[in-house]
Design a protein with these regions (language model features):
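Positively charged n-region of N-terminal signal peptides that target proteins for export
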Residues: 1-4
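Short linear motifs in exposed loops
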Residues: 56-57, 80-81
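C-terminal motif of bacterial Sec signal peptides marking the signal peptidase cleavage site
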Residues: 12-15
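Short acidic, Pro/Gly- and aromatic-enriched capping/linker segments at domain boundaries
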Residues: 27-47, 57-66
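A short, surface-exposed beta-strand/turn
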Residues: 63-79
Length: 108
């Protein structure tokens, strides 16, 4: 039981690491506040076409949610997933060409 509580506490504490741009940290904070109760909501860091992108994936609270991808200057780069099951980002299939670097945050 103690190990479970420690693991749960650790997972709940996953948040912005210090190496994220300030504008991304601000967006993560807002996303956490609005998506905290939405199972499946995540923030992930990707390498895509030589760039670092941050993916904000809606959880189950948004029935047709997808992943909004932002660059390091917080520009909305593209949107994938959603009800239309979009895969193309900047001319190529995002899911086939992106490398997931880390999970920054997961809703409980």
């Amino acid at each position: 039981m103690r190990l479970f509580l420690l693991s749960f506490t650790f997972l709940m504490s996953i948040s912005c690491s210090d190496d994220q741009p300030e504008c991304i940290e601000d967006q993560i904070t807002i996303f956490q506040e609005t998506q905290a109760d939405c199972l499946g909501a995540t923030v992930k860091k990707y390498r895509f076409q030589g760039m670092t992108l941050y993916g904000f994936s809606d959880g189950q609270c948004i029935s047709d949610g997808g992943t909004s991808l932002f660059d390091e200057e917080c520009n909305n780069f593209c949107f994938v997933g959603g009800i239309a099951a979009l895969t193309e980002c900047n001319g190529v299939n995002f899911f086939e060409n992106a490398e997931e670097l880390e999970t920054i945050w997961v809703a409980n």
